[in-house]
Amino acid sequence: MKLLFAIIQNDDKKALTRALIEHDISVTQISSSGGFLRGGNTTLMIGVPKEKLDVALETIKEHSSRRKIVTANATGIPHNVDSVSIPMSVTVGGATVFILEVEDFFRC
């Protein structure tokens, strides 16, 4: 059994969660944030048997779109009164997936 932690954009969570459930893959959503854009993320905790790992990863790829946004402070440097914001186009989205081996689990 594998445990996946998939960090995705909030915009992708509804479609991805629905698609995983359609493949009979259980999902737990955890709200998270981070990255230099400080945008809202969702971390999905997904437990899958080894034989469904490829299906889970392909589903995550299909439903975690990359897109460009324009941000005023893409550098991550805090603004101060004297600073000037320069709009920059930044690619966001996609997924970061951590795959862990599950030694054992049980349900109560």
Where does each model-flagged region fall?
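Positively charged, small/polar-rich N-terminal and surface patches that mediate targeting and assembly
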Residues: 1-108
